[in-house]
Amino acid sequence: MAKKIRIIDSTLRDGMHAVSHQFTPEEMAEIAAGLDAAGIDTIEVSHGDGLGGSSYNYGFAAAKDEDYLKAVSQVLKNSKLGVLLLPGIGTAHDLEMAAKFGAKVVRVATHCTEADIGEQHIKIAKELGMEAIGFLMMSHMVPPEKLVEQAKLFESYGADAVYITDSAGAMTPYDVKVRIEAVKAAVSVPVGFHAHNNLGLAIGNTLAAIEAGATYVDGTARGLGAGAGNSQTEILVAVLAKLGYETGVDLYKIMDVAEEVVAPKMRRPQIVDKAALSLGYAGVYGSFLLHAMRAAEKFKVDVRDILIELGRLKTVGGQEDMIVDVAYELSKANKQ
């Protein structure tokens, strides 16, 4: 019997980074209807930085969270509606609102050393009848044993699964393998993996995760996402089918959604350009890229220098304000 792999598609959440959070509710509904018809298990919807993310710091979205969720929930027939929540950005009220509009799955995302700040949100989600998944961001920054400790915390709070998340697209297949194997051996809940393609390794890393025991993996149509994007859902489905895995996704239909519905809405090609490659090389949070590109233009400095310095400083999600500081200091140094 073929091994079942659950695909969570994040085109309508991670993909929001690549369009500056400007998908309209109508565009989201159109994409979601296609993903649903293709057989995607779970469709994640929200601002790129999760529920409540629309703000000056993270970028204002084209519409409110509830407008997106309402629009998507009305077109789903089989897929589960999911959301992302970062404690400190999203609130318990946001969770309650999401549940009201039909969200069945929430991924509670914390920095890879801070699972404890997600305890309240995991427990509230469970009380609301939602599937709650712990999402350990920037997992390349700590060794496997630290991720084990944090994954066990999420499990103790009641999480239904735990994700190892390569937010910077900085991992190699070996990095993924040792982390997934360690966490898989330590928890009794399913383990998942979320990839970014900044080193061109998103699909390879996702396969390494599956071989190491992950049964939940992420993708986005056309790879739409922060930095160089994510694992392309349509490629992931094709490769997993060749390897004998069962995803429940219709390959032709997911190809059609990617090419005919998502591609025309893309602002720029989702490629590993020099800026995205610098993200992965430096190990910098993927959503920093567009902010860094704007700062580079404003201060007339090389975006790569900004990203490398942010990596040296070991910045994490939530420290977007440092991008301008770094760009300013580089500009000042260049004039001396």
Curated annotation (Swiss-Prot):
Keyword Metal-binding among UniProt keywords: yes
Reactions this protein catalyses: (S)-4-hydroxy-2-oxopentanoate = acetaldehyde + pyruvate
Enzyme Commission no: 4.1.3.39
Gene3D superfamilies found in the cross-reference section: 1.10.8.60, Aldolase class I (3.20.20.70)
Entry keyword annotation includes Manganese: yes
EC class: lyase
Active site per database record: 17
Keywords: Aromatic hydrocarbons catabolism, Lyase, Manganese, Metal-binding
Binding-site residues for Mn(2+), renumbered to this chain: 14, 194, 196
One GO BP annotation of this record: catabolic process
Chain positions recorded as substrate binding sites: 13-14, 167, 194, 285
Domain of life from the UniProt record: Bacteria
HAMAP family: HOA
Name of the featured protein: 4-hydroxy-2-oxovalerate aldolase
Record lineage: Bacteria, Bacillati, Bacillota, Clostridia, Thermoanaerobacterales
